[in-house]
């Protein structure tokens, strides 16, 4: 079985370079992306969203949430956004 490829959206790329999130990027590259390449659907920190966001998954990284979608046909994961948990529920 081929591994999934990872594509970062422009929104995510800009946000991860900001001071608020840049400390997470090495963790995402070294710890999260290897998990995604093997199986982006199942894991302790992976949850599929519901309702109008049912095509989006979220990955928990401590107090932060990484959001992504998966194109199963082309086997590509699109990293959409990252947010601090407390900012999501304001």
Residue ranges and their predicted role:
Residues 1-57, 72-74, 87-90:
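Basic, Lys/Arg-enriched alpha-helical interface segments
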Residues 50, 80-83:
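Residue-level detector of conserved, well-ordered beta-strand and adjacent loop positions
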Residues 58, 65-70, 75-81:
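Short, hydrophobic/aromatic-rich beta-strand segments within well-structured domains
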């Amino acid at each position: 079985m081929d591994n999934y490829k990872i594509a970062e959206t422009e929104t995510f790329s800009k946000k991860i370079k900001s001071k608020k999130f840049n400390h997470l990027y090495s963790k995402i590259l070294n710890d999260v992306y290897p998990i995604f390449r093997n199986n982006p659907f199942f894991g302790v920190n992976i949850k599929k969203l519901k309702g109008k966001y049912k095509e989006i998954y979220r990955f928990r990284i401590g107090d932060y949430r990484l959001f992504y979608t998966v194109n199963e046909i082309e086997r590509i994961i699109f990293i959409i956004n990252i947010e601090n948990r407390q900012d999501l529920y304001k």
